[in-house]
């Protein structure tokens, strides 16, 4: 036992039903571990001396309580599984059907999953996937993010392994046109 505590929020792919977070794969698979806490509802927690608002997937069941918690939070940092407008969901697609970001103006920093690629506006940070999943992920940096609870700084650790590569095929007729 290394004494590591894991805090995780329910996301849209871990919730079994689209309108509730109550039944989710994180609880079902990992509830026997004492060091893992799953958040199916929005909740403020302390990480060291830092208060952080954790926001799971917002759905019809928890929408009102989630927005109330966001509005009333005293935390300076929020972390969640959010679907916000104006960020790249994946290469070639910027989200336009999500939530407005204005509700998060009160926070110094917001970190989120959900979108599969990294993007940010200087205040809200989408962390992306730790690994490539689809062909359109090629050459899109993947990895994980380290967050410092004392300074609220973060940095990305890139995954050095890739699944997808761009390959160019030249026919023998075109080979004469290749420089070098």
Cite the ranges covered by each PLM segment.
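Short, intrinsically disordered, charge-balanced linker/junction segments flanking boundaries
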Residues: 1, 166-169
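Active-site donor-binding loop signature of nucleotide-sugar glycosyltransferases
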Residues: 57, 82, 129, 149, ...
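A conserved active-site cap/scaffold subdomain adjacent to cofactor or substrate pockets
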Residues: 119-120, 125-149
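Transmembrane beta-barrel architecture of outer membranes
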Residues: 142-144, 164, 172
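Charged, glycine-rich active-site and insertion segments that engage polyanionic ligands
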Residues: 155-167
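Conserved small/polar residues in nucleotide/adenosyl-binding loops
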Residues: 170-177
